[in-house]
C-alpha cells in the first residue's frame, strides 16, 4: 500500500471513530450546573473579565453500554470498511472470500481498543452552551470569554493511544487481507496477464511433449514393423538364389 494512501486511510478511519464515539458521548452527558447565563440590564454598566464555563457530567456506564453494543460496533465497522472501499484501498478484499474474515477482525479490534477510559480522559474540560445577554445603553463588556470544548474533545479522541491502536490495527488488517494493494493496480493486472501466459506456455510445452512422444512411438513401431518384413523377406531371397544356381548347372 502506498504511503500517502495509508496516511489518508489512517486519518479518515480516526475521524470516523472519533465522530462515532462523540455521538455516543452526547447521549450520555448531563449538565451539573445547568446552562451558564449572565444578564446585564440597565444603563452604564461596566463588566470586566467575564468567564463562562459549563461543567458537565458524563455517565461512564452509559458510554460503556453504548460503545459495547453490537449495533454500535457493527455500524462503526461498516463505516470504516465502506470508507476504505470508496478509496479503493483494499481492492482485492471485495473480490475474495476473505471479506467476511476482515470485517470480523475489524469489529474485534474495535471491541478490544475502545474502552470507557478513552472517553473519560477526553471530557475533563468539556463545556456546552454559554449565554451572555446585554440590554440597555452605554454598557461596556470587556474581556468576555466563552469556553467551547467540543473541538478539544475531538482532538483528544483523535490523538489518543487507544484510537491510534484501533486505527493501526484496522490498517494492518486491511494490509493483511489485501495483499495485492502493495502494488500498482496496473501491475496487478500485468501479473494476472503474465500468469495466464505462463499457464499457456506450460500447456504448450505439455502439448509439444505429447506430440514428440507420439512421433517417437510411431517411429519405433514403424521401424520394428519394417525390420520384421526384412527378416521375412531374407529366406525367400536366399531360396530363389539357390534355385537359380541349380538350374544353371
Swiss-Prot record:
Tell me where in or outside the cell this protein is found.
Answer: Host membrane; Virion membrane
Q: Is Lipoprotein included in the keywords of this UniProt record?
A: yes
**Keywords for this protein:** Capsid inner membrane protein, Host membrane, Lipoprotein, Membrane, Myristate, Signal-anchor, Transmembrane, Transmembrane helix, Virion
**GO CC annotation terms, alphabetical:** host cell membrane; membrane; viral inner membrane; virion membrane
Q: Name one Pfam family in it.
A: L1R_F9L
Membrane topology value? Single-pass type II membrane protein
InterPro entries given for it? Answer: Virion_mem_poxvirus_L1 (IPR003472)
Those parts of the protein on the Cytoplasmic side are: 2-199
Lineage top rank: taxon: Viruses
Extracellular side of membrane: 221-249
Lipid-conjugated positions (N-myristoyl glycine): 2
Role of this protein: Essential for viral fusion with host endosomal membrane and core release.
Q: How does it assemble?
A: Interacts with A151R.
Family affiliation: Belongs to the asfivirus E248R family.
Q: What is this protein called?
A: Inner membrane protein pE248R
Organism source for this protein? African swine fever virus (isolate Pig/Kenya/KEN-50/1950)
